[in-house]
Swiss-Prot record:
It comes from Flavobacteriaceae bacterium (strain 3519-10). Acetyl-CoA carboxylase is a heterohexamer composed of biotin carboxyl carrier protein (AccB), biotin carboxylase (AccC) and two subunits each of ACCase subunit alpha (AccA) and ACCase subunit beta (AccD). GO terms for molecular function: acetyl-CoA carboxylase activity; ATP binding; carboxyl- or carbamoyltransferase activity. Its main location: cytoplasm. PANTHER family: ACETYL-COENZYME A CARBOXYLASE CARBOXYL TRANSFERASE SUBUNIT BETA, CHLOROPLASTIC (PTHR42995:SF5). This is Acetyl-coenzyme A carboxylase carboxyl transferase subunit beta.
Amino acid sequence: MAFDWFKRKTKNITTSTEDKKDVPKGLWHQTPTGKIIEHEELKANNYVSPEDGFHVRIGSREFFSILFDDNKFTELDANVESVDMLGFKDTKAYVDRLKEVKAKTKLTDSIRNAVGRVNGEQMVISCMDFAFIGGSLGSVMGEKIRRAVDYCIANRLPYMIICQSGGARMQEATYSLMQLAKVQAKLAQLSEEGLLYIAYLCDPTFGGITASFAMTADIIMAEPGALIGFAGPRVIRETIGKDLPEGFQTSEFLQEKGFVDFIVKRTEIKEKVSKTVKLLVH
């Protein structure tokens, strides 16, 4: 045949791997702009690329390490876990999905509460984990935020929520949607007590989170370039049949329109939060 020269004459050719070197996973990170960053350098810079300023998506472990002095904090309500109240099943049973994501992430749900000091200022921080079913809002998130607010009221402490979520958890249906009202009611109590509430919006913050407590904080901060909105840009574009403005739904766009108070780099968030607490609490 004309293309016989493409064929191997000898089958099952093997290549020796004796001299090959394994590269540990996570040793290097590539940003969307193509910049290659060594993992240790990235970690030392709070997971922000020093080359282009890109903020790599991180979870509660990293955020607590960045914010709390010497990474010392006490986790609150760690034993609260999701249950399959509806026997829900989509492509797989919800109970099986929970087991898989818990094993993969070593988390119990999509949010963690902790109390500690940020540059000496004691406060409570709730941080969402996007790696746990997209940081979705379920009954556990609502309950943990309720308990965090009660702790703040009992101990007269400021409160911060780090938001990164795709919205409500569909597997919990109405139970999930009920959490919006539940959380807002508790945050109203926090406000009535004269206690500070700070929200830090990270990429992405969407759905019911944006439609409720992400946008009702006393001070709203956001990471540079974070996507923030209710529905995604593709859904909006297909619904209205028009192209969207450039930079639509970015934190910078929202600050320009008055929805975000400050754009704060992750490398500066600890200092910004502690200064805000000093200014507004003392």
